[in-house]
Amino acid sequence: NAIYTNKMAKTIIKYIKYIKGGLDVRRKFKLVALTTAMVMTAAAVMGCGSQSGDGGTAAPEEKNTENNVESSVESGSEESGEVDVFARYDEPVEISSVKNLGAGMQFPEGDSLEDNVWTRYYEEALNIKVNWVWSTNTEQYAQKVNIAITSDDIPDVMQVNASQLKMMYDNGQIMDVTEVAEANLAPFTKEVLNSDGGLAMQAATFDGRLYAIPKIGSPLMTAKVLWVRTDWLDNLGLELPETVEDMRNIAEAFTTQDPDGNGVDDTYGLAVYKDLYGSGYADLTGFFNAYNAYPGIWVDKGDEVVWGGIQPEVKDAMAALHEMYAAGQIDPEFGVKDANKVNEDVSAGRCGMMFGDFWNMAWINDAKIKDPSFEWVPVAIPSLDGTTPAKAQLSASTVDFYVISADCEHPEAVIKMLNLQLEKSYGETAEPEVYNITPEGFGTYQYPVVSIEPPMKNFTAAQKVTAVINGEADPDTLNDEERGYYEMACKSLDGDHKDNNWHQLKMYGPGGALGVIYDNYWVSGNVVNDAYYAAPTEAMAEMLPTLKKQQLQDYTNIILEGDLDKFDSFVANWNQLG
């Protein structure tokens, strides 16, 4: 931005930002090479809106914009102690947003995105009305956000990825929320946002100022497991896989030995979706990890941090995937099937293994209801050599962020909604059976405008639920949310799989995915963390989306064609451009 090449302009802009309470005025001047005189004129005009009572312009003391935002938000201030962070507005406040309709989002009869338990509670508790500008599925969401950014059609608050955050910061489209956050975040919200030692807050910080609220989560929740159809294993007299060789032998057997016993050649071994990784369902991240490859994160090699997607171990995994594809162990049409289409195959009994997230059984719970013999079990990522356990790659604690538009009239309302979501879902006054997951299995946790969660709470819940089911603890040790999981898991154990009961058992019960992840990766330290956790650099924001797209295209072509020289060409191109 040419305006920042002028030292006087930079000083004036900082001054205007201060007297306007943090409004990012770069938006008024973005991508225009202004002279010092033009900037001074603009400063004078904007200064008229911040006059003192006697008609003079306020002259505040210059602020230090290099303050560490983590410490300010974590500790708060004397003024923040005087703010009722749950106070209801006297007059209605409207907040506009957009929605990523996540996997399996459903509403009780009569409810909708516009009218549900959370939108009603916003109005009841805070007098805030939510206006959804648009909504779309996960696969289209990033594209629609890009269009909104390009057209400058920004709602009051929306969820963005790291590259989009950097783009909007550079464009001056988002608000500096340092003071708003400091004054309005509830203590519990501050605690959760800083639960990773401040890394998430650092990723949302530019030049010492906070420009987004990180959608903090648990990196461990991004670890993958291998889901296997154990009824097919039983039919063929096979054991659960422990090594890569075991996995590949099972894939061959599931493809060639009629595991469903219907006498028809209609099954294959490993489910894969068209984008290979990123969906969490039929996601090859775990397959790559089995080969000690980590294609979607930055990896610490000791003396340098490198992109995992161009390391030599990836080539070995690609060779194996092509062999499996050529042998019919992977759907020949995987390249055109999104996760929903792959799920149709899995639910219809055409596939027997897939790598994915802990929640994957949510998508096929209905298939379990129709056929109780339909049984899947999660196992840890197989070991390559049978001796050294595989390490699961973990994303950063924050990969998405909530940004507030520079034009938002009530930025504190967004913070209030976040406080409310966290408190009613996980705080001392939580009602998880209403605001998290209902007894009927509706995931109301998907409905809020903004939401975060304590990073380890699901793993704690799984340990406690499993202990009670195993008779090692009393049900009275469970909180309301955990009791809900326990009751649903018990129903599934008794043969009642409806209302997502089986899905809850497969997450929280004995042998469930959360326990597999915690015991095999976390306790033993078998993880590879994303080594980059700051806000994206200018080069990252500009080049990484294009390079990632090229990576996906080249990986897919290699699986289909088996030309491993393309990987070497891809690496050379990456190093040249990146």
Regions found by a protein language model. Name each.
Residues Y4-N6, T11-K20, K28, L34, ...:
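Conserved N-terminal structural module of periplasmic/extracytoplasmic solute-binding proteins
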Residues V32-M40:
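Sec-dependent N-terminal signal peptides
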Residues A43-G47:
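C-terminal motif of bacterial Sec signal peptides marking the signal peptidase cleavage site
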Residues L101-V117, L220-W227, D234-L240, K274-A327, ...:
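Extracytoplasmic/periplasmic substrate-binding proteins
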Residues K129-S135, E333, V377-V379:
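General small-molecule cofactor/ligand-binding pocket signal
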Residues P155-Q159, G352-D357:
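Paired acidic/hydrophobic, glycine-rich loop segments that form the ligand-binding mouth/hinge
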Residues T205-S279, V299-D345, R350, Y402-P439, ...:
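Helix-loop-helix "hinge/cap" segment bordering the ligand-binding cleft or interdomain interface
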Residues K424-D554:
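Conserved small-residue motifs centered on glycine
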